[in-house]
Amino acid sequence: MDTQAFRRSLHHSDRYNRRGFDSPTKRAQALEEAYQSDLISSIRDNGFTYTKGRLNIKLAQAFGFCWGVERAVAMAYETRRHYPNENIWITNEIIHNPSVNDHLRKMNVKFISAKNGIKDFSLVSNGDVVILPAFGATVQEMKLLHEKGCHIIDTTCPWVSKVWHTVEKHKKHVFTSIIHGKFKHEETLATSSFAGKYLVVLDLEEANYVSEYILGRGNRNEFMNKFAKACSNGFDPDKDLERVGVANQTTMLKSETEEIGKVFERTMLKKFGPENLNSHFLAFNTICDATEERQDAMFSLVDEDLDILVVIGGFNSSNTTHLQEIAITKNISSFHIDTPERISVKENSIFHKPLGSELELKNNFLPSGKINVGITSGASTPDKVVADVIEKLIDIAS
């Protein structure tokens, strides 16, 4: 499929909307009423610090809702107000935040069900309204919904769309897209649907593995078994890794994405020489500004004198997980929670998710005496949720 031609055609349809329905002023006001917090505003104004009794809170200087998330959430809410009586569906979670998604359910927005990773669109009918989430949707899903005669409300983050343009450029010039991401993640599934040949690498270790194969130091069967679910149909590593371009899932760790780009640039330079590099490697710049800002702020926060650190965001949120990774590199006692309800004031306990593990209970997690607590949140976490967490910490400390 010519994905660029399809998207151009879709954008000109009178059943497609990517701008929303409210004015920017009204949209900002609605979000402020729903999700902003006076406490968080005052902490920002006070240099991102707050002291109450023995508790000293230090907030990251960039955290919480990013512009793309604010836009997606606002458009989803506007859609229900604009279509008060129609069936409204959403192809996935609007963002990785349980409270926001629960609010959509209360507004009678229906979530497309999936079984074994396959979505069931059979209940979606002509004239229904379908919201595409901030992560985007696959081009196949868009085509299906368009052919069904649905009204499509596209809240895809513009930074995600930018990555789609990048992989389409790779396809046009017959380069394989190497996508730094999680192959099951909604955003990467969408991005790969716009690519031609592609391979998804999770981290630097996998990138180095692919590099070794390109340089002739790998086993084909082992390679294909390793990446069986993370490559395009008919992928041939002996042919499809001769010309590569790098792209990324926008929520991945910025420093790792940059290093993966350097790995493949060095690999192609070594194999084909400097005079042929541009024919075998395409440079990239698809790192999301908001992701970069939050990760940079986290690196600054973990350099502070902290006793513990609380990371707030959905457990399936990639950008939140990477914030947790940064804390771990500094050996700070850190706790990833998705809602304030994970903290028990009465028990001084926290039900949290260690990186790569199942949820576990930590009793007496807030130490006695003076304590410095660092706090950050993922791009899908409203300020009000952060404020509720701080209030619980204050209650425990007092």
Curated annotation (Swiss-Prot):
- GO biological process per UniProt: dimethylallyl diphosphate biosynthetic process; isopentenyl diphosphate biosynthetic process, methylerythritol 4-phosphate pathway; terpenoid biosynthetic process
Q: Which residues bind dimethylallyl diphosphate?
A: H96, H185, S317, S318, N319, S380
InterPro entries per UniProt: LytB/IspH
Catalytic positions are E187
Instruction: Recite the UniProt keywords alphabetically.
Output: 4Fe-4S, Iron, Iron-sulfur, Isoprene biosynthesis, Metal-binding, Oxidoreductase
Keyword Zinc found: no
List required co-factors. Answer: [4Fe-4S] cluster
The Swiss-Prot or TrEMBL record annotates one GO molecular function as:
4 iron, 4 sulfur cluster binding
What EC number(s) is this enzyme filed under?
Answer: 1.17.7.4
Q: Which residues are (2E)-4-hydroxy-3-methylbut-2-enyl diphosphate-binding?
A: H96, H185, T250, S317, S318, N319, S380
Query: Which superkingdom, per the lineage?
Result: Bacteria
* Catalytic reaction annotation: isopentenyl diphosphate + 2 oxidized [2Fe-2S]-[ferredoxin] + H2O = (2E)-4-hydroxy-3-methylbut-2-enyl diphosphate + 2 reduced [2Fe-2S]-[ferredoxin] + 2 H(+); dimethylallyl diphosphate + 2 oxidized [2Fe-2S]-[ferredoxin] + H2O = (2E)-4-hydroxy-3-methylbut-2-enyl diphosphate + 2 reduced [2Fe-2S]-[ferredoxin] + 2 H(+)
Asked whether the UniProt record includes Oxidoreductase among its keywords, one would answer yes
The enzyme's main class, written as a single word, is oxidoreductase
Biological pathway: Isoprenoid biosynthesis; dimethylallyl diphosphate biosynthesis; dimethylallyl diphosphate from (2E)-4-hydroxy-3-methylbutenyl diphosphate: step 1/1; Isoprenoid biosynthesis; isopentenyl diphosphate biosynthesis via DXP pathway; isopentenyl diphosphate from 1-deoxy-D-xylulose 5-phosphate: step 6/6
Q: Which residues bind [4Fe-4S] cluster?
A: C66, C157, C288
Membrane-spanning parts: none
| Residues at which isopentenyl diphosphate binds | H96, H185, S317, S318, N319, S380
- Details of cofactor binding: Binds 1 [4Fe-4S] cluster per subunit.
- Could you tell me which NCBIfam families the record lists for this protein? ispH_lytB, PRK13371.1
Q: What job does this protein perform?
A: Catalyzes the conversion of 1-hydroxy-2-methyl-2-(E)-butenyl 4-diphosphate (HMBPP) into a mixture of isopentenyl diphosphate (IPP) and dimethylallyl diphosphate (DMAPP). Acts in the terminal step of the DOXP/MEP pathway for isoprenoid precursor biosynthesis.
Similarity-based family: Belongs to the IspH family.
Identification of the protein by name: 4-hydroxy-3-methylbut-2-enyl diphosphate reductase
